[in-house]
């Protein structure tokens, strides 16, 4: 949206494909996992699916579960059409020798993994390719896992070695014709180099190109909820003319940054992956002077749960753009300590601009991941501020569902989804100030009434659990989520935590003469079931007794929306026109009205997944307004009070879900 400080406001929707240059590298790729101890993050050249199910442990890669579709993709190297051949090999073995008798599955390679958007990130998360490896039956295979090899394979010998020292799997291209190419898979004794068996087949040339991955793929839930390690891998090597190197695709150890600049203070949050305990826990921030000299301006400890380092620097004496870099010295696998830099630019406050451009986002699902159309087109507009109004992640994001407990696994599960957000928007975030605020799905809720931070009483029925009000997840986990998304915002107006010690972040920020109030319209909101009659049969915030109730029956004088603390903040904010403020804008998760419509026969939103998607310009027949109390049209009394305060500042409202 474009915000003109002269007169009116023009709202435009900015939805944003990018290609990266490659280096045709003749050197072989060789994995290096010889780190001391354990580390969840595999390294800057890899993406693991999912993050919490893999680790480096004493010099090798391990899959920590016996479950379906676990993989580690190489993101800096690809197989491409321009070459003619490649070879690839890895050592592989069973972590648990009893796996052969208990599980059906396989381990090995994925060749030519591709998604639907022709992007290496999409390939790494959703790509499908040619499987090639060894099954728990002892058969080698390429492509069709259900077919048994006809070659004379000594299956017992293969499985015995897999259970002991492991074997070396080697795949290479063979003969080729115009349309097809031969793939040959061989198994070797890892110690002696003796060839144990081989299997070959012909594959369409076009499907060999794409990402390369290691994979452990077993029947789901063999061990129920028990996490049982399955396979280890080591010495992954690839070479050949089809192999191309993209060094700029490295992801980490600084994954991405977010920053704000307001009233002479800049705050920058750097996001890190789950590094091992033996890695350094401090990062520093440097600014570049006019003489291109870098000066250290802050050093911070990486928070052990959110894996963030947040820097705060007074920049009131630096009115222009400020080149910055986050500096981290660490120990990559197989190397001495190295120093990595992640650079960006803190933009000058655009107070001299007549028009301020704001790109606003909400509901960042992964249907179009990595959203290259969105990011490229947004950058064409060169916005002055990015605003993410909630649901930066959804529970199913990236596949594999979501983890509610234990807290350590739930944390890594969330971080993987959050890293995907940074993978999408990182190039914008490093150079453009941004606001992010958390909504329900960010904290693993379908709907949320924060009720001042109370603990929601657990219930097997998710709707009942949410209707109780408060947070389902532990407070330390909620605080972790908020640190990842909001710690770069200006300091909160009143930092006192709410119930359970859950932190707050509501604040104000000045950009280009516009004062933005950033509020939390979910954290204090009362759950309707706590204050409304049982006769309304409230389920997940919907009165299911009737399609439409008298609005007066649904209102409650007791129910809160923003709470006393945020109302006091807004009363202060609307009266404060300091710091060259000439316009005001409010940022919230949800609009202060109930505008959703549903068919007149529906009593809740459970029908939504079954509704027909209308064409542009077409409106559904028989739709009428809803009484969804997850929206901020409810509670009406508290909503009206909030609007009365906000209108005193003539504030333009930027909000997310309807809800």
Q: Where are the regions a protein language model picked out?
A:
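Metal-dependent phosphoester/phosphodiester hydrolase catalytic core
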Residues: 103, 107, 174-179, 186-188, ...
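Bacterial Sec-dependent signal peptides at the C-terminal "C-region" and cleavage site
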Residues: 3, 15-28
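Short carbohydrate-recognition loop motifs
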Residues: 52-70
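Flexible glycan-contacting loops in extracellular carbohydrate-active proteins
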Residues: 194-231
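Extracellular carbohydrate-recognition regions
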Residues: 24-50
């Amino acid at each position: 949206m474009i915000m003109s400080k002269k007169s009116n406001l023009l709202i435009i929707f900015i939805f944003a494909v990018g290609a990266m240059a490659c280096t045709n590298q003749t050197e072989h790729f060789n994995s290096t996992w010889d780190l001391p101890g354990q580390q969840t993050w595999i390294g800057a050249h890899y993406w693991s699916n999912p993050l919490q199910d893999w680790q480096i442990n004493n010099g090798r890669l391990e899959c920590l579960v016996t479950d379906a579709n676990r993989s580690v993709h190489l993101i800096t190297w690809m197989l491409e059409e321009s070459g003619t051949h490649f070879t690839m090999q890895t050592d592989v073995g069973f972590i648990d020798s009893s796996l052969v008798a208990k599980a059906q599955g396989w381990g090995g390679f994925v060749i030519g993994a591709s998604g639907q958007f022709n992007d290496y990130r999409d390939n790494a998360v959703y790509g499908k390719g040619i499987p090639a490896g060894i099954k728990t039956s002892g058969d080698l295979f390429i492509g069709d896992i259900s077919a048994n090899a006809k070659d004379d394979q000594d299956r017992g010998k293969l499985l015995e070695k897999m259970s002991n020292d492991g074997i070396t799997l080697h795949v290479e291209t063979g003969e080729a014709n115009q349309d097809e190419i031969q793939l040959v898979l061989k198994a070797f004794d890892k110690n002696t180099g003796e060839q144990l068996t081989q299997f070959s087949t012909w594959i369409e040339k076009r499907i060999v190109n794409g990402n390369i991955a290691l994979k452990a793929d077993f029947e789901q839930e063999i061990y129920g909820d028990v996490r049982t390690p399955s396979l280890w891998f080591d010495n992954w090597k690839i070479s050949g003319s089809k192999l191309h190197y993209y060094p700029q695709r490295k992801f980490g150890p600084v994954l991405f940054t977010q920053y704000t600049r307001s009233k002479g203070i800049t705050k920058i949050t750097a996001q890190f992956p789950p590094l091992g305990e033996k890695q350094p826990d401090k990062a520093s921030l440097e600014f570049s002077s006019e003489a291109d000299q870098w000066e250290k301006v802050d050093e911070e400890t990486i928070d052990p749960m959110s894996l963030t380092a947040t820097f705060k620097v007074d920049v009131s004496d630096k009115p222009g753009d400020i080149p910055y870099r986050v500096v981290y010295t660490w120990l990559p696998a197989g190397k001495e300590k190295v120093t990595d830099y992640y650079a960006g630019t803190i933009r000058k406050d655009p107070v001299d601009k007549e028009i301020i451009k704001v790109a606003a986002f909400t509901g960042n699902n992964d249907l179009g991941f990595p959203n290259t159309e969105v990011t490229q087109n947004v950058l064409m507009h060169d916005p002055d501020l990015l605003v993410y109004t909630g649901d930066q992640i959804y529970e199913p994001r990236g596949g594999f569902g979501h983890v509610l407990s234990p807290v350590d696994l739930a944390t890594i599960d969330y971080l993987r989804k959050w890293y995907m957000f940074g993978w999408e928007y990182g190039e914008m975030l490093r150079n453009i100030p941004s606001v992010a605020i958390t909504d329900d799905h960010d904290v693993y809720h379908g709907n949320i009434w924060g009720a001042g931070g109370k603990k929601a009483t657990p219930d097997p029925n998710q709707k009942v659990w949410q209707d109780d009000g408060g947070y389902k997840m532990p407070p330390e986990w909620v605080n972790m989520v908020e640190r990842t998304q909001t710690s770069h915002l200006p300091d909160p107006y009143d930092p006192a935590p709410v119930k359970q010690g859950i932190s707050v972040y509501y604040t104000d920020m000045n950009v280009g003469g516009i004062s933005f109030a950033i509020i939390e319209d979910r954290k204090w909101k009362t759950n309707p079931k706590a204050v409304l009659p049982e006769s309304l049969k409230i389920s997940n915030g919907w009165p299911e007794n009737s399609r439409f109730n008298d609005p007066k029956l649904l209102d409650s004088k007791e129910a809160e929306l923003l709470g006393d603390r945020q109302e006091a903040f807004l009363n202060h904010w609307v009266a404060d026109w300091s710091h060259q403020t000439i316009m005001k804008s409010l940022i919230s998760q949800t609009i202060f009205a109930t505008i959703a419509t549903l068919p007149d026969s529906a009593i809740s939103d459970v029908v939504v997944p079954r509704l027909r998607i209308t064409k542009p310009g077409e409106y559904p027949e028989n739709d009428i307004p809803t009484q969804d109390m997850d929206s901020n049209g409810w509670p009406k009394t508290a909503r009206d009070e909030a609007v009365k305060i906000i209108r005193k500042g003539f504030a333009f409202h930027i909000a997310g879900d309807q809800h």
